[in-house]
């Protein structure tokens, strides 16, 4: 439609111009030519143009799938490797993601061309002449040097440390709509100065499972991932033992539906109150998730479960 309009404008300008070489005519010709170059003239090009338009959204969804499987399917293996002294940093995970994407491409790729038959002599051995034998030796030497180089690069990659912290967003872990009880637990209005908290490690110990399995079993449970400043504050207040890895805070009252009733009092005994600055950060984090969840509520609840 855009090309049709431009052609009509060009036709009018050509009719009003004596020699058809005015600046406006030349400008319209240039615009029409540029628009035609951007147009797809076959099905693959047209679909690829649509792909480029939606590529950012597609890539974001793929990234969410990778994160979900990292936090659920792969997390026990990652934790086990780290306990055994292995380094599982961002470069290792990125390599794993690339392998996953490469494997996912195979069903959509063309079948490989058939290999030519291998020539053999009468004794069943490969029939190669001396020149081919010499070339194979050279390729073998080059392969050896490449292998050594690859090992050195791999060693350099393993020596790198550090992985950027990523926010924990429970709404990404499952595709099914959350229940009303799950939504209400993220309401920031239920969190005040009298709210008692407990670490996820303590709850997991009572339930006899690691925290990763706890979050896999209850992917939408309310939790707050402490950053380094939060952990330092809790450590200075003797509320947290300094340890490597992430620290999650849960609302102690939420444990009533998780642990057996006989152990709930033990949970309350090790729970604690937190200071206002940290409480404000927790409420802010809860509010962002609650805004995404509350669309599933039929009506605004007046009390909290």
Swiss-Prot record:
Where it sits in the cell: the answer is: Nucleus
**Tissues where the protein occurs:** Ubiquitously expressed.
Instruction: Enumerate the GO terms in the molecular function aspect.
Output: DNA binding; nucleosome binding
- Matching Pfam families, A to Z? DNTTIP1_dimer, TdIF1_2nd
The source's superkingdom equals Eukaryota
Task: Give the DNA-binding residues.
Answer: 158-170
Segments carrying the region annotation (Disordered) are 138-168
Q: Which InterPro entries match?
A: DNTTIP1_dimer, TdIF1, TdIF1_C
- List the GO terms this entry assigns under cellular component, sorted alphabetically: nucleus
The UniProt keyword set, sorted, is: DNA-binding, Nucleus
Keyword DNA damage carried by entry: no
- Main localization, broad class: nucleus
Instruction: Write out the function statement from the record.
Output: As a likely component of a histone deacetylase complex, together with saeg-1 and hda-2, functions downstream of the cAMP-dependent kinase egl-4 to regulate the expression of genes required for egg-laying and foraging.
> Which proteins does it associate with, and in what oligomeric form?
Interacts with phosphorylated egl-4. May interact with itself. May be a component of a histone deacetylase complex containing saeg-2, saeg-1 and hda-2.
This chain belongs to which protein, by name? Suppressor of activated egl-4 protein 2
- Organism phylogeny: Eukaryota, Metazoa, Ecdysozoa, Nematoda, Chromadorea
